[in-house]
């Protein structure tokens, strides 16, 4: 390749990389896999190695991430947020070690301590504390400037808002992520994220922080900017002491074989971890050596990321079917010829949405590249159009719901398309009924998935109203329930008793039970406390058809939630279902408090078994009293409530000087000052 050709190819690669950086970092919507992106970068680096004179005019090679999104305020990083160079094989790691020793004037026979950490597949962020209080949080952005996400980050559970004994100024950096199980539930609840990383990034970069607050975001911190610690190992321990979440899977070793075994261990067992990782990060452990090694404009010389290879394979799309979730989102699914990917037989893959099918032009009969994204959810990443038969036609996305025929709706600036049939749509019904009887809704004990499926298949429960006429239907039918396997007189009696007991329900739980898109437990509670009675709430929901802006006066209710409520209450099927449902129910008014409890605004944690109620009931009572209930202790915990046989949290609370309450004392704290109307 001549230099002129190399320059043209370099410009082309830079343009492609810049485009995909924007999609990944700013839009949270990557269109190629990590492996494909790495190939582009590798090609660019090969050209620069062969033609170093082109490097001086190749400004884009120094970029990190992408330009901050204009919808967020810009934040200048005091210390540039660098990305890491990648290694793709064992030889790259060996070269990294050799090069590091050479730069440190070490003999190659000398050992060097390396910190080995998991590479979390999430969103990099920085948090600055001033005099122990959160002052600012930001994304990486382009490395020089990030996006101000302070209010969004404050909603992340277990992130300290206040740090005791902190220096006047402290900057920590880490990775925001979401567990795979929470990601799956998020998509079941009406979202359509491609993978957990996109879900985490999209959740953090919401203009409406109430949406961020509803997402179960987590984080790990991995560094302190300008740390006074002597080693990376010491830095991680210091972060723990300050109350931050730090990943437990780390080792420090002088042996390269141990470092590579660490990689192999997690590559082979990463599906056993609850969150996505996409490699291992190796860092020189000694901080002084890190300073000596320094950094290029893009990445530190003292660290490298050893990426996991993508698990991909090619197979045939036999059919494209449409799956309808609980909240009505239509998700296209590729029905595949069985293929082994990473030891797992894959027969179906997500196509995400209509836009994704159109962009990739995926057709029934195509040969496609399938990747197990995050080792869990297979997705189609590309089409081999060289193998496409001429007679294959474009896939036509349905214009009405394939299940119930209701209208489809697509919100502005959203890729998800969903059915407006809600409580009428057959494909949504079973999932909605499961949600309806769940613990935070009607809490009908003994109504598990198997029982629901049985009654559904028998035609006895085809909508949520049928639950409350089930006993009458069975008594008037030829079905002898007690004679069937798994049913006895006691279990039947308990089920019908649970159904009858659930007929009195709080307004908050009733609203949540309806399973309206974007109306989770938190929003249901806000709506209930605002309208107080069912009659008032229902009347105001009907107003949405004429005027949806009035709901904006309710703090923490955003445009997406309002529009979702409007779509629900303008569908006559849903109104008919609600009106039939309330005939069987007593919906109690929301409770108001005229005095604050002693726990109002406090963070509490429970340990041990409670004598008077379940942990779930205790959590509900505490939250009603204004407390925040956490599952883990930190310096930000105000009280530990101790039941019988307390666990290790009891000793930890003592060491952190956290106030300890007995169950009886806790009951006094939430009761005496609370006056319920």
Swiss-Prot record:
Alphabetic keyword roster: DNA damage, DNA repair, DNA replication, Ligase, Magnesium, Manganese, Metal-binding, NAD, Zinc
Matches recorded under SMART domains: BRCT, LIGANc
A Pfam family matched in the record: DNA_ligase_aden
Record: active site: 119
Keyword Manganese attributed: yes
Single Gene Ontology BP annotation: DNA replication
Cofactor(s) in the UniProt record: Mg(2+); Mn(2+)
Any one GO molecular function term: DNA ligase (NAD+) activity
One term under GO cellular component: cytosol
SUPFAM superfamilies named among the record's database cross-references: BRCT domain, DNA ligase/mRNA capping enzyme, catalytic domain, Nucleic acid-binding proteins, RuvA domain 2-like
Keyword Cell division found: no
Domain BRCT: residue ranges: 594-677
Entry's transmembrane regions: none
Enzyme class: ligase
UniProt-listed InterPro entries: BRCT_dom, BRCT_dom_sf, DisA/LigA_HHH, DNA_ligase, DNAligase_adenylation, DNAligase_N, NA-bd_OB-fold, NAD_DNA_ligase_OB
Positions of Zn(2+) binding: 401, 404, 419, 425
Binding site for NAD(+): 34-38, 83-84, 117, 140, 175, 283, 307
Reaction(s) the record says it catalyses: NAD(+) + (deoxyribonucleotide)n-3'-hydroxyl + 5'-phospho-(deoxyribonucleotide)m = (deoxyribonucleotide)n+m + AMP + beta-nicotinamide D-nucleotide
EC id: 6.5.1.2
Function: DNA ligase that catalyzes the formation of phosphodiester linkages between 5'-phosphoryl and 3'-hydroxyl groups in double-stranded DNA using NAD as a coenzyme and as the energy source for the reaction. It is essential for DNA replication and repair of damaged DNA.
Record HAMAP family: DNA_ligase_A (MF_01588)
Family according to the record: Belongs to the NAD-dependent DNA ligase family. LigA subfamily.
Protein name: DNA ligase
């Amino acid at each position: 390749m001549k230099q002129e050709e190399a320059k043209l190819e370099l410009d082309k690669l830079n343009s492609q990389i810049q485009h995909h950086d924007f999609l990944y970092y700013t839009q949270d919507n990557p269109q190629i896999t990590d492996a494909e992106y790495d190939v582009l970068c590798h090609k660019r680096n090969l050209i620069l190695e062969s033609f170093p004179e082109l490097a001086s005019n190749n400004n884009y090679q120094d970029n990190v991430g992408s330009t901050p999104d204009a919808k967020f305020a810009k934040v200048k990083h005091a210390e540039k947020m660098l990305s890491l160079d990648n290694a793709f094989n064992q030889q790259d790691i060996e070269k990294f070690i050799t090069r590091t020793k050479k730069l440190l004037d070490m003999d190659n026979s000398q050992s060097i301590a390396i910190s080995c950490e998991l590479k979390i597949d999430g969103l990099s962020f920085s948090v600055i504390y001033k005099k122990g209080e959160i002052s600012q949080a930001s994304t990486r952005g382009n490395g020089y400037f990030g996006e101000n996400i302070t209010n969004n980050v404050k909603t992340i559970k277990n992130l300290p808002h206040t740090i005791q004994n902190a220096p006047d100024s402290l900057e920590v950096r880490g990775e925001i992520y979401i567990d795979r199980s929470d990601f799956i539930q998020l998509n079941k609840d009406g979202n359509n994220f491609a993978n957990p990383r996109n879900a985490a990034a999209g959740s953090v970069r919401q203009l409406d922080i109430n949406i961020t607050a509803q997402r179960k975001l987590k984080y790990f911190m991995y560094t302190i900017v300008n740390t006074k610690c002597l080693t990376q190992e010491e830095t991680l321990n210091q972060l723990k002491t300050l109350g931050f979440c730090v990943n437990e899977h780390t080792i420090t070793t002088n042996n390269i074989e141990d470092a590579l075994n660490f990689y192999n261990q997690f590559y082979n067992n990463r599906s056993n971890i609850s969150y996505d990782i996409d490699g291992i990060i190796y860092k020189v452990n000694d901080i002084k050596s890190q300073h000596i090694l320094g950094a290029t404009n893009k990445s530190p010389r003292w660290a490298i990321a050893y990426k996991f290879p993508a698990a991909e394979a090619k197979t045939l799309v036999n059919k494209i079917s449409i799956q309808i979730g609980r909240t009505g989102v239509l998700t296209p699914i590729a029905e595949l010829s069985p293929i082994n990917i990473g030891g797992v037989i894959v027969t179906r893959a997500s196509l995400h949405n209509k836009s994704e099918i159109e962009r990739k032009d995926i057709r029934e009969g195509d040969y496609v590249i399938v990747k197990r994204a995050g080792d869990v959810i297979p997705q189609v990443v590309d089409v081999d159009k060289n193998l496409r038969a001429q007679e294959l036609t474009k896939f036509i996305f349905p214009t009405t719901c394939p299940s119930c025929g209701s209208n489809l709706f697509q919100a502005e600036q959203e890729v998800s398309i969903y059915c407006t049939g809600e409580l009428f749509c057959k494909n949504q019904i079973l999932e909605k009924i499961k949600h309806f009887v769940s613990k935070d809704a009607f809490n009908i004990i003994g109504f598990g998935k198997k029982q629901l499926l049985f009654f559904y298949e028998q035609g006895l429960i085809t909508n949520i109203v049928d639950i409350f006429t089930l006993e009458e239907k069975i008594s008037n039918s030829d079905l002898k329930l007690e004679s069937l396997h798994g049913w006895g007189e006691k279990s039947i009696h308990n089920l019908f008793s649970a159904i009858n007991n659930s007929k009195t329900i709080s307004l908050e739980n009733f609203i949540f039970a309806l399973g309206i898109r974007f109306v989770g437990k938190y929003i249901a509670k806000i709506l209930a406390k605002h309208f107080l009675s069912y009659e008032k709430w229902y009347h105001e929901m009907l107003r949405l058809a004429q005027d949806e802006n009035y709901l904006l006066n309710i703090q923490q209710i955003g445009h997406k939630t309002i529009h979702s409520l409007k779509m629900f209450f303008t569908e006559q099927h849903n109104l008919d279902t609600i009106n039939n449902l309330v005939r069987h129910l007593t919906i109690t008014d929301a409770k108001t408090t005229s005095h604050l409890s002693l726990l109002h605004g406090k963070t509490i944690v429970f340990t041990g078994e409670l004598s008077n109620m379940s942990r779930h009931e205790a959590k509900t009572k505490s939250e009603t009293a204004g407390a925040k209930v956490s599952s883990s202790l930190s310096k930000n915990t105000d009280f530990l409530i101790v039941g019988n046989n307390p666990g290790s949290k009891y000793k930890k609370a003592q060491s952190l000087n956290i106030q300890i309450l007995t169950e009886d004392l806790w009951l006094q704290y939430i009761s005496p000052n609370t006056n319920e109307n």
